[in-house]
Amino acid sequence: MTSVAPALPHPSLRHIEGIIFDMDGVIVDSEPRHQQAFMDIFHEIGYADNHGIQFEDYLGKSDRAVWDDFISMHQPPYSIEDLTSRKQNRLIDLIQKEKPIFETLPALVEKLARKFTLSVASGSLHPVIDVVLKLENLRNFFPNVVSSQDVPKGKPAPDIFLKAANSMQVSPDKICVIEDAAAGVQAGKSAGMTVIAITNSLPSSALSQADIVVSDYESIESLLLGRP
């Protein structure tokens, strides 16, 4: 009888006990929907053609970062709370209508949840996170969820990942972060965590600070769980 060697994770990841997923661009293909939601609100308030926002500069950052800069540029007669609420509601409408979960993501999450403690740490607000995690019953696999609204500073500061680690009761050096944005990669490294970056939103050259860069979810599965 021929014995089959057990599947083993990548040597640099064998110490990992917890995994933190970014949400936008990792769990859900929401970056285009974020941009559409912002554009819809800019149009509503009369700034469709002169909003002055370069969306690529905010990839991985919170909505507040966008609105802070927009208000600084234009001083519109709207509060940041009003603008944030409008954009959030529009984004929720788009996500509920289009359900843009990455196709192979749910199967990966289910497999990882059998071995690791999982968390979501997202720049989105809790109402948006809740809507996304209801899709494909993903909420069942993420007992710990942290939003940028829960911490003093959003990405690229490490606050959100450190709070997630505390909730997971896992040491930061035993956590792997899965990210798609340079700001998130920087935040994960600053938190003392291992970072796998996936090229859903940016080319590998923009994610070079990550420990490992991959192009698909099958590669993440192989790295963390091994292949038989």
PLM-predicted stretches and their roles:
Residues M1-E17, L125-P228:
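Asp-based, Mg2+/Mn2+-dependent phosphohydrolase catalytic module
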Residues T2-E56:
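Active-site neighborhood of HAD-like aspartate-dependent phosphohydrolases
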Residues L8-H10, H15, D93-V120, H126, ...:
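Short, acidic loop-to-helix structural element flanking the phosphoryl-transfer center
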Residues Q35, M39, D63-D68, Q88, ...:
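An amphipathic alpha-helix signature
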Residues I41-F42, S62-P76, V132, A165:
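Helix-loop "lid/cap" segments that line or gate small-molecule binding pockets
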Residues Y47, P76, L138:
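Hydrophobic patch in the ABC ATPase nucleotide-binding domain
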Residues A48, T117-L118, T194:
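Residue-level detector of anion-binding/catalytic polar loops
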Residues F70-P106:
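Metal-dependent phosphoesterase signature
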